[in-house]
Amino acid sequence: MKNNNAFTLLELMIVIVIMGLLATIVMPGIMNRPEQARRTKAIVEIRQIESALALFKTDVGRYPTTSEGLAALVSNPGVKNYNQDAYLDKLPTDPWGNPYIYICPPIKGKYYDLKSLGKDSEEGGTEDNSDIESWNNEI
């Protein structure tokens, strides 16, 4: 009797084909992760900004106006009861390097509109290019 402990050429080719098929299925999911990580970071940063806005409202009695913008969370826009240490250390930018958009009074949100334009830096978009909005269920 012959002892066959080695793979035949056919068995090796079948394994290589299966690995190739698995790679084509798995790779798109792996390659998309960096963009998903950026979107998740934007969501977390929007939540942090919302917390700073809530503290500002507690101290000052109102949210910053659109003209004061998010800069009001970094330096006093000339209001009473401003707590310099309680808000943000620096003006945030989204993971794509663009400023977050803040509007108060809001157009779509309940108290204010806060959003990132996403990967394409343009209004609207779908999937990776969609806007990340504080009033959206994604957050």
Pin down the residues of each PLM region.
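Short, surface-exposed interaction loops/tails
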Residues: Q36-R39, A54, A71, P95-I139
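A residue-level signal for beta-strand positions that form part of recognition/binding surfaces
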Residues: A6, D85, Y111
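Generic leucine side-chain signal with a strong bias for well-ordered alpha-helical environments
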Residues: L9-L12, L21-L22, L53, L73, ...
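Extracellular/periplasmic head regions of type IV pilus-like filament subunits
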Residues: T58-K108
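Conserved hydrophobic/amphipathic alpha-helical signal-anchor segments
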Residues: R33-S75
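Non-catalytic, surface-exposed connector residues within folded enzymatic/regulatory domains
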Residues: T24, T40, P64-S67, Y82, ...
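N-terminal single-pass transmembrane signal-anchor helix
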Residues: K2-I30
